[in-house]
Every structure is written in C-alpha cells, then in structure tokens.
C-alpha cells in the first residue's frame, strides 16, 4: 500500500475483485478524476477537482475525492505517480505520494495504489487536440483525460494479471498447484 511503497504498485496484487476503480491525477492546481465501469474494462472522465492549499484530512480536495469514492462505491483508488523517463521520482512524485497517503487514511479500508503515470498528461493533451478540442480552457479537461489514461493503463494491466471473475488471491492459489 501507499505508506510503505517507494515506487508504483502493480495491478492484480491484493486485487479487491470486481468493482469500480477511481483514478486521480494530482496536480499543483487541479486534480483530474476518472472512474471505471464495475467490470474494470473502461475508464471514463468524472470531473476536475480544484486543489486546496490546505493539507489536512479535512481539506476540500480530499473531502471531494472521498465523496466521489463513496458515490461510485469504489473498491480501489489509483493515484498517478509522476516519474522521469528514467523512472526517478522528483518533487511532483513526492506531492502525489503525500496526497495518496492522506487519501489512504481518509478512505480506509479501500486501498489506494500508486501507478506510473509517465507521459499521461502529454498523451491526454495530444488526444484532445487531435479530437478538435481548442487549447483555450483545455487544462481541466486535460487533467480528467490524464486520469483516464492512468486508469485505463491500470485496468489493461490488471486484466492481464487477473482473469475475469477471480481475485489475485485465487490466482496465487492456482500458482501453488
């Protein structure tokens, strides 16, 4: 889980099974939010949450994410972990990890995972531009699209790690046979 992790988590490890997942792209000004369908196949944008200057457990951004997790009945939350192309972590990764730790305390027992999000914002911006979205006022949409990229990558990797209808515990038992 987040508290002891140095790097990103791997999908399928301690998998909670069927249910919606929420992904967040933590920025210094905004937080992009995406959700999956209950079967964990498709990621879709939810909203962009303004980032609060407060850093406590009752900060408005944390409260809004908690409400979204509750509203969507999420079984897992994935937080994008920005790393360099060499896999190193800088200031942005520290901010995302700190946010993930605060969120974990607020939504327990729902697991909060870190996922490598290299180039998701670049990919999201390019995809929006190619679909004809104008640059002006695009930042909130880019944040949501980046969260979709983070979540879709997690879901795709999870589908390779966990067969439909089985949890990671089932897969581990199967490997012991």
From Swiss-Prot:
GO biological process terms held by the UniProt record: rRNA 5'-end processing
Location(s), subcellular: Cytoplasm
Region (Disordered): 1-20
Keyword Cytoplasm: yes
Short name of one Pfam family: RuvX
Protein known as: Putative pre-16S rRNA nuclease
A GO MF label: nuclease activity
Function: Could be a nuclease involved in processing of the 5'-end of pre-16S rRNA.
Cellular component GO terms, alphabetical: cytosol
Record-linked InterPro entries: RNaseH-like_sf (IPR012337), YqgF (IPR005227), YqgF/RNaseH-like_dom (IPR006641), YqgF/RNaseH-like_dom_sf (IPR037027)
Catalytic activity, EC: 3.1.-.-
Tagged with keyword Nuclease: yes
Keywords: Cytoplasm, Hydrolase, Nuclease, Ribosome biogenesis
CDD domains noted in UniProt: YqgF (cd16964)
Similarity comment: Belongs to the YqgF nuclease family.
